[in-house]
């Protein structure tokens, strides 16, 4: 969240006496600004303070990723996380980055990755836990289609081999074979 974004949220509350209801609205607006930008675990709050100075101080706890864990968190799992997620441990937790990583994993047809965000050990930290119930990573299909031309033969026999995550990098390998079908 940029300084100008926060100034826009704070402006209506500046240079005036604020009631407790106004303070609640202020906090709500600031937290909404963080959430709207994807920072769902970042929170603003008011600490006890002396209001005789006629100013208030908002405290912001940045929501950070303690770790992103996949399955048993083996080296293979960590490699998959590294290649799928644009963020990692110690970074600000932006739900859009986490969703992007999940989408990268789920682009493989054999994956069904889901996430859960839970509190970390330190204030402001969260653990992103990924579970992935995979299906068979190999598929083989045969077919006949009429997408050929008169020069290649109208009917085409096809064979397709798809292998997901062969190198454990969220990779997809596809091998296609087409051949003109014989007319009987």
PLM-predicted stretches and their roles:
Residues 166-172:
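Short loop/turn motifs that connect adjacent beta-strands in outer-membrane beta-barrel proteins
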